[in-house]
């Protein structure tokens, strides 16, 4: 079973507890790292542990050092898209979308960054309607992009 790691922007209580109540193993940022730990430091450690990173509305694609941390460490990074919604609503959508998320993870090799969207209309979350999952970037896409300039590739020191 996949284990998940929640970034600090998902909070310590509501989001992880909702996932746990629904049978998902969850590790919370605050239990493993200092609150001010830079993302580029904890991302590789979380990836080494095999945990899937969950974050909310985080634009890691536009922060080169964080993007490199994901791609160079073979992290699996799910960005939960929700705008300005409560963590509990993101958690409900995650649980509703769990089957699609698990399928996506099984079908995509690490590293990757994917977005988990809420259903349309958003009221579907409360009715149990699943959202969707979309790949935003994988390793090959990163290597081809100018965002990888200056960072080592696999097999390079």
List each language-model region with its residue ranges.
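N-terminal intrinsically disordered, cationic/polar leader segments
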Residues: 2-3, 12-13, 17-21, 25-27, ...
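Alpha-helical segments flanking ligand/cofactor-binding loops in enzyme cores
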Residues: 43-44, 68
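Charged phosphate-binding loop/patch that engages nucleotide di/tri-phosphates or the phosphate backbone
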Residues: 103-157
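Short beta->alpha connector loops at strand-helix junctions that form conserved
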Residues: 30, 56-57, 80-82
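Conserved BB-loop
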Residues: 25-39
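Short acidic active-site motifs
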Residues: 14, 37-42
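Mid-chain, well-packed structural core segment of small domains
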Residues: 61-100
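Acidic, metal-binding active-site segment of PIN/NYN-like and related structure-specific nucleases
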Residues: 39, 50-66
């Amino acid at each position: 079973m996949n284990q998940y790691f929640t970034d600090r922007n998902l909070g310590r209580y509501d989001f992880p507890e909702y996932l746990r109540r629904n049978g998902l193993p969850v590790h919370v940022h605050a239990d493993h790292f200092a609150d001010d730990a830079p993302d580029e430091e904890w991302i590789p450690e979380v990836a080494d542990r095999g945990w899937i990173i969950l974050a909310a509305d985080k634009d890691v694609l536009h922060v080169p050092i964080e993007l490199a941390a994901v791609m160079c460490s073979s992290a699996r990074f799910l960005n939960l898209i929700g705008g300005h919604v409560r963590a509990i609503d993101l958690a409900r959508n995650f649980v509703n979308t769990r089957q699609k998320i698990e399928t996506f993870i099984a079908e995509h090799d690490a590293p990757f960054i994917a977005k988990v969207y809420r259903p349309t209309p958003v009221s579907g979350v409360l009715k149990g309607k699943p959202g969707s999952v979309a790949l935003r970037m994988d390793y090959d896409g990163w290597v081809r992009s100018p965002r990888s300039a200056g960072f080592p590739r696999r097999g390079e020191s």
